[in-house]
């Protein structure tokens, strides 16, 4: 019986060590996914492929950590582009018929995003 317990512990240890470590979305992933939105959000072009990017980001942000990381990146981007139309940014989810759990705005508290 002791040998069975040792084998079970070894198998459990291997499962923990080998399990993939999930990492939050990076700002690079978020910005590349939403790059098609920039012309639209800066009043320089049509909506084009923007909604595909918004829907793609929604699909990538499956966990709370991912959603908070995406929120922080979008918040930072919204603050850094001086000619970004914040009204268009805030309405982007409804324009693209998607539901995200936060407003795209420099004032969003990303720590509260679930």
Curated annotation (Swiss-Prot):
<feature type="disulfide bond">
    <location>
        <begin position="71"/>
        <end position="110"/>
    </location>
</feature>
<dbReference type="GO" id="GO:0008289">
    <property type="term" value="F:lipid binding"/>
</dbReference>
<feature type="signal peptide">
    <location>
        <begin position="1"/>
        <end position="23"/>
    </location>
</feature>
<dbReference type="InterPro" id="IPR036312">
    <property type="entry name" value="Bifun_inhib/LTP/seed_sf"/>
</dbReference>
<dbReference type="GO" id="GO:0006869">
    <property type="term" value="P:lipid transport"/>
</dbReference>
<feature type="disulfide bond">
    <location>
        <begin position="51"/>
        <end position="96"/>
    </location>
</feature>
<dbReference type="InterPro" id="IPR016140">
    <property type="entry name" value="Bifunc_inhib/LTP/seed_store"/>
</dbReference>
<keyword id="KW-1015">Disulfide bond</keyword>
<dbReference type="InterPro" id="IPR000528">
    <property type="entry name" value="Plant_nsLTP"/>
</dbReference>
<keyword id="KW-0813">Transport</keyword>
<comment type="function">
    <text>Plant non-specific lipid-transfer proteins transfer phospholipids as well as galactolipids across membranes. May play a role in wax or cutin deposition in the cell walls of expanding epidermal cells and certain secretory tissues.</text>
</comment>
<comment type="similarity">
    <text>Belongs to the plant LTP family.</text>
</comment>
<protein>
    <recommendedName>
        <fullName>Non-specific lipid-transfer protein 2</fullName>
    </recommendedName>
</protein>
<dbReference type="Pfam" id="PF00234">
    <property type="entry name" value="Tryp_alpha_amyl"/>
</dbReference>
<keyword id="KW-0732">Signal</keyword>
<feature type="disulfide bond">
    <location>
        <begin position="37"/>
        <end position="50"/>
    </location>
</feature>
<keyword id="KW-0446">Lipid-binding</keyword>
<feature type="disulfide bond">
    <location>
        <begin position="27"/>
        <end position="73"/>
    </location>
</feature>
